[in-house]
């Protein structure tokens, strides 16, 4: 995973989606038009967290760079940077962190 010069703001997370499956368990090739949108990816960068209600301190995020996360199917904003595709998610769009 290459270093990216994108720094998310507040409680935003920059994720690079893992590749979608290209074949089924039985060996059938899945055409591009029928592929499911991936819901798992690797965290590339993390914002500093959002401010608490008093605006006095930041609330840290539960994820860190390098974590593998599962996120909402339709969450986030897709971007392209230096030929790579990324997703900017809100911390609320992250459903789970995958343990290694």
From Swiss-Prot:
Residue positions, PTM N-acetylalanine: 2
GO biological processes: cellular response to heat; chaperone cofactor-dependent protein refolding; regulation of DNA-templated transcription; response to antibiotic; response to heat
Pfam family for this entry, one: Cpn10
Protein transport listed as a keyword: no
Disrupted-gene phenotype: Essential, it cannot be deleted.
SUPFAM superfamilies: GroES-like (SSF50129)
Induction summary: Induced in response to heat shock (45 degrees Celsius), pH 4, pH 10, ethanol, H(2)O(2), hyperosmolarity and starvation.
Job of this protein: Together with the chaperonin GroEL, plays an essential role in assisting protein folding. The GroEL-GroES system forms a nano-cage that allows encapsulation of the non-native substrate proteins and provides a physical environment optimized to promote and accelerate protein folding. GroES binds to the apical surface of the GroEL ring, thereby capping the opening of the GroEL channel.
Name of the protein: Co-chaperonin GroES
Gene: groES
């Amino acid at each position: 995973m290459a270093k990216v010069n994108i720094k998310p703001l507040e409680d935003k997370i920059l994720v690079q989606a893992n590749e979608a499956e290209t074949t089924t368990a039985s060996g059938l090739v899945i055409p591009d038009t029928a592929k499911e949108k991936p819901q798992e990816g690797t965290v590339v960068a993390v914002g500093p967290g959002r401010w608490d209600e008093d605006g006095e301190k930041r609330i840290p995020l539960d994820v860190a760079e390098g974590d593998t996360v599962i996120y909402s199917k339709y969450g986030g904003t897709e971007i392209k940077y230096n030929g790579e595709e990324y997703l900017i998610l809100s911390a609320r769009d992250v459903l789970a962190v995958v343990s290694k």
